[in-house]
Amino acid sequence: MFVNKKYTAKGKNLPSSPKKVRPIANNIRGKPYNEAIAILCSMPNKGAKLLGKVVKSAASNAMYHNRNLSEDMIFVKTVMVDDGRKRRSIWPRARGRADRLINRSCHIFVEVYEKMYGGE
């Protein structure tokens, strides 16, 4: 087995906390594409749905650029979940006080490789 070419996809400012998406990303790192999608579809998390969209986008980028490529030849190489923008707002509380509310977002970067078999 040798690795021929890499294809990437990015999801920016996705509405989920990076802390919630990272454990899901760890489950699919290094897995074949079909297995990674099966894992993500079986998870009930919002982050799994967002991650699935980015993984599918990376795979479709790979199949668009290489017409001879099938889903069986693709595997997930790199999955990075970084902090995105934080939306801060005020949450009114009792007796005239206010708390700060921080809505977090994340950036997801997925890199897939094509797996080819050949003689050595």
Swiss-Prot record:
The record's Gene Ontology cellular component field reads: cytosolic large ribosomal subunit
Give the UniProt keywords, A-Z: Ribonucleoprotein, Ribosomal protein, RNA-binding, rRNA-binding
Query: InterPro entries per the record?
Result: Ribosomal_uL22, Ribosomal_uL22_bac/chlpt-type, Ribosomal_uL22_bac/org-type, Ribosomal_uL22_CS, Ribosomal_uL22_sf
Q: Which GO terms describe its biological process?
A: translation
- Top-rank taxon of the source lineage equals Bacteria
Output the Gene Ontology terms for molecular function: rRNA binding; structural constituent of ribosome
Self-association and partners: Part of the 50S ribosomal subunit.
Name this polypeptide is given: Large ribosomal subunit protein uL22
Taxonomy-wise, where does this protein's organism fall, top ranks first? Bacteria, Pseudomonadati, Spirochaetota, Spirochaetia, Spirochaetales
